[in-house]
């Protein structure tokens, strides 16, 4: 039987999953995206060249690797086509290696309009979405109004479903938000064009995954966003609209729990968050700005500055428990170079009580005060180091503390953006 590894974010997203997925795809059968949409931004740096992927799995830069988009992903036709064409312009063969589940829902133009209208109307209470229609597309999926890739094969039924969806969404857009509605014929014609484009890539992703496992091939499941943004387990309502946990990998790709051999949780050596929502260890000072500048902490999808703070072990332990994380990968260690001292949040003060567990609601998180352990920093550069022994003693001590406090072994340490800037302590496929 083959080996399957799930790579997912153990914080609020932007942990560096794309680089690690690319790193682990050297000898692999397939990479599958199982949730989210083009709100993800996975940045890869190979031989100094930067590539940002939003929808296509990060394994696409490896020749011969099959890339799958599962039923749990919501697909923007325009974004998919743009990303394919940009990659093909670099000389890569894309469409023959990209397979898309017919059950994947489509992000329609009215989803984007609704997303943006809501954020504008919310004003200061806005969640901070990317405004790309992700949430409304998932709403239609649950409300059984969604249009899926499979529907494109049946023009008459597509027209009927599109009319029904537009009746609903145009009513909301015009009557509730006071913005223009959408034209049926234009959207329908665009969908017919996209139907021809996507048809050769349409395939039974779940079936492919089962066959690969029987053939003894390695499969990597690539998560987007992070555990603390999960629709069920995150800081609701400041969350994404999909399941970002290992449970989402199972349902979003169509495999069983027995098909997963290893869960790799990715976490930065500090913490970041984009948009609104609680963030107990946030550093709204020159220390936080310094981390942002050194770490180039600006969203790959939106360009928005990320909020930066100290490592939060309470939150990390929650992610480890929810996902059954087998091993951790700590990224961006080099961003902490040159800092006199570092802090790790080990507990919260909440209503005059100390707790090592995270509250179950966003308001509770907002009312938490972090309890810190302090560690000495290091002046030496860790950038590009590939050996544990060559790390400064203080950096090793910091990582060992993270490992012990989180109750989960560290298998990989990333010391820079390039594929080679990595310390591999334990290969998840070994």
From Swiss-Prot:
Pathway linked to the protein: Purine metabolism; AMP biosynthesis via de novo pathway; AMP from IMP: step 1/2
Locations listed in the record: Cytoplasm
Residues noted as binding substrate in the record, renumbered to the chain: 300-306
Listed SUPFAM superfamilies: P-loop containing nucleoside triphosphate hydrolases (SSF52540)
PROSITE patterns: ADENYLOSUCCIN_SYN_1 (PS01266), ADENYLOSUCCIN_SYN_2 (PS00513)
Single GO term (MF): GTP binding
Keywords (A to Z) from UniProt: Cytoplasm, GTP-binding, Ligase, Magnesium, Metal-binding, Nucleotide-binding, Purine biosynthesis
Domain of life where this protein originates: Bacteria
Family: Belongs to the adenylosuccinate synthetase family.
Name under which the protein is recorded: Adenylosuccinate synthetase
Organism: Xylella fastidiosa (strain 9a5c)
Lineage, uppermost ranks: Bacteria, Pseudomonadati, Pseudomonadota, Gammaproteobacteria, Lysobacterales
